[in-house]
Swiss-Prot record:
Its EC number is 4.1.99.17. Belongs to the ThiC family. Its cofactor is [4Fe-4S] cluster. [4Fe-4S] cluster binds at C563, C566, C571. GO terms for cellular component: cytosol. It comes from Rhodopseudomonas palustris (strain TIE-1). Transmembrane segments: none annotated. Catalyzes the synthesis of the hydroxymethylpyrimidine phosphate (HMP-P) moiety of thiamine from aminoimidazole ribotide (AIR) in a radical S-adenosyl-L-methionine (SAM)-dependent reaction. One of its GO terms (molecular function) is carbon-carbon lyase activity. NCBIfam families: PRK09284.1, PRK13352.1, thiC. GO terms for biological process: thiamine biosynthetic process; thiamine diphosphate biosynthetic process. Homodimer. This is Phosphomethylpyrimidine synthase. Substrate binds at N221, M250, Y279, H315, S335, R336, G337, D376, G377, L378, R379, E415, Y442.
C-alpha cells in the first residue's frame, strides 16, 4: 500500500506492505543474539505439504507491518551504536552545506531539506576503521556476523543438499562453501575478495556483502537529471527498487538539488548507496570539466562521506597516456566520468588528478570506510570496441590502484563493461581476477549486442548471467530506457527483475548451495497446479497472476489443472499426473504389459503379449479415448483386482 505518514509535508508516498503471501521474519545469529537479520518468508498454501520458504530480503523496514514509516524522519540508525562501541571514531560538526552543493539552485526550485541532522563520525588515529582493517587483524565485526546469517538465508537445517549442489555447479575457481560462517566472511574480506560497503555514517544500513563466493548481487541506478525527475520521485524509486530485490542503489543525480536528493535517499535507505562524486563536482564548476580542481573534488568527497555514501565510483584509471587509444573506436569514450576526466587531461595536458592524488583519496575514504568502486571510464560502448587496448590498459591500472588502496586499509571493488559479445565475456572475468587480485568485479551487463534499443535489459541480462556465472560479484542493472531516457519506476522494476533472474541463474550455475531451493519449490507447485504458490514463489507475483488472470480470472481457475496455453486436454503435467494415478492402480498382469521382462515394475511372471492384449481390450472397453476420467479408471481397476 501507499501511505503519506505526514500530511503536513509535500513528501511523496512510498510503497510499503508485504509482497503477496509473504511476511517479514528475522533470524538471530547465535554469536550475536542482539542482531535481527531480515528475511522474507513466502507462505505456501495448506495443500503444499511443505514448510514455508525463507528468501533473501532487501526491502528493509518498508515491508514490516510493525514499523511506522515516515520518510520525513528517516529510518532507525542501529548501526551507529555498533560503530561507536568499536571505538576509534569521533563525532564532529562536519562541513557546512554550501549553495554549490545543490548546484546553486534558486529558492524557486530548491527542494525541501531533510530536517533531521546527524553529526558525522570519522576515524581517528591508527585504530581500525574499515571492515578490511578489522578483517586483517582477525576481528569479526557485527557486520560480518550479520551478512553471514543473511547469506545462509536463515535455513541451515535445509542445506543438507549443499554438497551435492556445489558438486553439480561449475564455479570456475570460486570457493563457495556449503555454509557461510562469520569467520569465512572475515577471511574473504581480509583477502580482498569481498567487501561490506558500509560507511560509518550510514546508520540506517542493513549490511550486505559483495564477493564471488557469495550470492550474486545486483545494483539499481536512480537519480535526477538536468531535465527531469524530483527528490520525491527518486526516494520513491529507491524504495521501489529494493522492494523488488536491488541489493545496492546508486544515486547518479546530475541536475539540481544533488545534495538534498542524496540526503533524503540515504536517510531512508537500508541498502548501500553509491555515487559518482565527479558528477556533483562538475555541477559545482558550472558543468565545465576544464574548471575542475583537486580541491573541489576533495571537498565533494568529504561532503558525501559525511552524509554516509557507502561506495564511490572513482575513474582514477583514466590516464592521459591512454586517451589516444580510444581515437579509433566506433563509439569513443562512453563513460560520463571517463569523458569528463579525459577532457580535463587533454585541456591541461596533465595526468589525471584522480590518479596523482590517489593516496590522499585513500586516506580520506578510510576515515569513513567508504568503499572504492574503481570506475571503468574507458569501457567499450559498442561490441566493436570490446576488449581493446584502451579497456585493458585501464584495467591493468585499476589492478595497481587496488594494491595501493588495500595497503591504505580500504575496501575495493572493480567496475567492468559495458558492451561485450558473448564469446569475449569470459576473458574479461579472467583478466580482472588476474590483474586485480580477485577483488570483486561489478559490471554493467555486459550488453551482448547493439541492435535492440528499448530491449537492452534483455541484451544485457544475457551477458550479466554469463559473467555472473564466471565470477562477477555484482551486476549493475540496465533498464529498457538504456540509451533512450531516464528510467521511471516501471523501468526500475523491469530492470531489477531482469537482473534478479540473471543473478539467480548465475548462482544456480555456480552451484550455490541454497539457490535451487526456490526453483524446486516452484516446480513442485507448478506440477501440483498450486497456482497461488506458483505466483507467490516467483520474483514478481503481481505480474504472474495478472498474466494468468487475463484469460482465467475466476477463483475456480486457481485450482484448475490446466492453463490457457494448452487447455484441459493437452496439459502435459495433467496428463503425467493421470498416467501416474493410472499406473498406481494397475494390477500385476497389467503392469506386466507396461514393463520389460526383469524391470523393477514387473512383480510377477507373465508374457508381455498377454498383458498387451489385456490392456488393448480394456482401452476399447472404456471408450477408446486417449484422455480418461480418473474415477472410471479406479472403478475399472477395482473390478479387475
Amino acid at each position: 500500500m501507499n501511505i503519506r505518514s505526514n500530511p503536513e509535508t509535500t513528501r511523496a508516498a512510498v510503497t510499503t506492505g508485504a509482497l503477496p503471501s509473504s511476511k517479514k521474519i528475522y533470524a538471530t545469529p547465535a554469536s550475536a543474539p542482539d542482531l535481527r537479520v531480515p528475511l522474507r518468508e513466502i507462505i505456501l498454501s495448506e495443500g503444499a505439504g511443505e514448510p514455508n520458504l525463507p528468501v533473501y530480503d532487501t526491502s528493509g523496514p518498508y515491508t514490516d507491518p510493525t514499523v511506522v514509516i515516515d520518510v520525513n524522519k528517516g529510518l532507525p540508525r542501529p548501526r551507529t551504536e555498533w560503530v561507536k562501541q568499536r571505538g576509534g571514531v569521533e563525532q564532529y560538526e562536519g562541513r557546512d552545506i554550501k549553495p554549490e552543493d545543490n548546484g546553486n539552485v534558486g529558492a524557486a526550485h530548491a527542494a525541501k531539506a531533510f530536517t533531521a541532522h546527524h553529526q558525522p563520525l570519522r576515524g581517528i588515529s591508527d585504530a581500525p576503521i574499515t571492515q578490511y582493517e578489522f578483517a586483517r587483524r582477525g576481528i569479526i565485526t557485527k557486520e560480518m556476523i550479520y551478512v553471514a546469517e543473511r547469506e545462509n538465508l536463515g535455513r541451515k537445517q535445509q542445506l543438507e543438499r549443499a554438497e551435492a549442489a556445489l558438486a553439480d555447479g561449475e564455479s570456475f575457481g570460486a570457493a563457495v562453501p556449503a555454509f557461510i560462517t562469520p569467520e569465512f566472511v572475515r577471511d574473504e574480506i581480509a583477502r580482498g575478495r569481498a567487501i561490506i560497503p558500509a560507511n560509518i555514517n550510514h546508520g540506517e544500513l542493513e549490511p550486505m556483502i559483495i564477493g564471488r563466493n557469495f550470492l550474486t548481487k545486483i545494483n539499481a541506478n536512480i537519480g535526477n537529471s538536468a531535465v527531469t525527475s524530483s527528490v520525491e520521485e527518486e526516494v520513491d524509486k529507491m524504495v521501489w527498487a529494493i522492494r523488488w530485490g536491488a541489493d545496492t542503489v546508486m544515486d547518479l543525480s546530475t541536475g539540481r538539488n544533488i545534495h538534498t536528493t542524496r540526503e533524503w535517499i540515504l536517510r531512508n535507505s537500508p541498502v548501500p548507496i553509491g555515487t559518482v562524486p565527479i558528477y556533483q563536482a562538475l555541477e559545482k564548476c558550472e558543468g565545465d570539466p576544464v574548471k575542475l580542481t583537486w580541491e573541489l573534488y576533495k571537498d565533494t568527497l568529504i561532503e558525501q562521506a559525511e552524509q554516509g555514501v557507502d561506495y564511490f565510483t572513482i575513474h582514477a584509471g583514466v590516464r592521459l597516456q591512454y586517451i589516444h587509444l580510444t581515437a579509433s573506436r566506433v563509439t569513443g569514450i562512453v563513460s560520463r566520468g571517463g569523458s569528463i576526466m579525459a577532457k580535463w587531461c587533454l585541456a591541461h595536458h596533465k595526468e589525471s588528478f584522480l590518479y596523482t592524488h590517489f593516496d590522499e583519496i585513500c586516506d580520506l575514504m578510510r576515515k569513513y570506510d567508504v568503499s572504492f568502486s574503481l570506475g571503468d571510464g574507458l569501457r567499450p560502448g559498442s561490441i566493436a570496441d570490446a576488449n581493446d587496448r584502451a579497456q585493458f590498459a585501464e584495467l591493468e591500472t585499476l589492478g595497481e590502484l587496488t594494491k595501493i588502496a588495500w595497503a591504505k586499509g580500504c575496501q575495493v571493488m572493480i567496475e567492468g563493461p559495458g558492451h561485450v559479445p558473448m564469446h569475449k565475456i569470459k576473458i574479461n572475468m579472467d583478466k580482472q581476477l588476474k590483474e586485480c587480485g580477485e577483488a570483486p568485479f561489478y559490471t554493467l551487463g555486459p550488453l551482448t549486442t547493439d541492435i535492440a534499443p528499448g530491449y537492452d535489459h534483455i541484451t544485457s541480462g544475457i551477458g550479466a548471467a554469463m559473467i555472473g556465472w564466471f565470477g562477477c560479484a555484482m551486476l549493475c542493472y540496465v533498464t529498457p530506457k538504456e540509451h533512450l531516457g531516464l528510467p521511471d519506476r516501471n523501468d526500475v522494476k523491469t530492470g531489477v527483475i531482469t537482473y534478479k533472474i540473471a543473478a539467480h541463474a548465475a548462482d544456480l550455475a555456480k552451484g550455490h548451495p541454497a539457490a535451487q531451493l526456490r526453483d524446486d519449490a516452484l516446480s513442485r507447485a507448478r506440477f501440483e497446479f498450486r497456482w497461488q504458490d506458483q505466483f507467490n514463489l516467483g520474483l514478481d507475483p503481481d505480474t504472474a497472476q495478472a498474466f494468468h488472470d487475463e484469460t482465467l480470472p475466476k477463483d475456480a481457475h486457481k485450482v484448475a489443472h490446466f492453463c490457457s496455453m494448452c487447455g484441459p486436454k493437452f496439459c502435459s503435467m495433467k496428463i503425467t499426473q493421470d498416467v501416474r494415478d493410472y499406473a498406481a492402480g494397475l494390477g500385476d498382469n497389467e503392469k506386466a504389459a507396461l514393463y520389460p521382462v526383469g524391470h523393477a515394475g514387473m512383480t510377477i511372471s507373465g508374457t508381455i503379449e498377454d498383458g498387451m492384449a489385456q490392456m488393448s481390450a480394456k482401452f476399447k472397453e472404456m471408450g477408446s479415448s486417449v484422455y480418461l476420467d480418473a474415477d472410471k479408471v479406479k472403478e475399472s481397476n477395482k473390478a479387475l483386482s
